[in-house]
Amino acid sequence: VMNQLNITKAFVLGVSQGGMIAQYLAIDYPELVEKLVLAVTLCQPNETSKSVISNWLLLAKEKDFKQIFIDTAEKTYTERKLKTYRPFYSILSKLTEPKNLDRFIIQATACLTHNALDEISKIQCPTFVIGGDNDKIVGSSSSCELANHIAQSKLKIYNGLGHSTYEEAKDFNSQVLSFFDN
């Protein structure tokens, strides 16, 4: 796609599963990635991610989208945000429910099997790793693990935030833009 658009080099931001994909872009096509931001993601499954995603897969096989929706929200957002969202779980889950969960199952399985640990050190571009110390989906140590294996990395951990750090941290966008600008 980048070739078709005549993009020779890019600043890449990958969040959650998008961060897993962005890792492989930077590993396999280093000439295309000038700078990389990896937010609330991991380089290999850990106990937290395995437990959470395996539970979602069980719920998907039972076709229980409402419970997937609720569990995802409860594990993604801070209590402050959840107070706003909880009254709307029922209607939001109905509005966002897919026709079937096949794609969800494929994506969740991809997250469970993603393991770039042996290759992550091949990332050569400047990389900004961002996480939250209360991430209940990929775990709080996943960002540190990523940063420890990428030579030119900078690490930022937000206290009190979790998997929604990219949404709830007031300075997330400015931090990312500042990294890309420098």
List each language-model region with its residue ranges:
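Flexible "cap/lid" loop of the alpha/beta hydrolase fold
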Residues: 23, 27, 34-62
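Short beta-strand/loop motif that positions the catalytic acidic residue
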Residues: 123, 129-131, 135
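Short beta-strand immediately N-terminal to the catalytic nucleophile in serine-hydrolase-like folds
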Residues: 12-14, 39, 130
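Conserved alpha/beta-hydrolase "acid-adjacent" motif
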Residues: 136-142
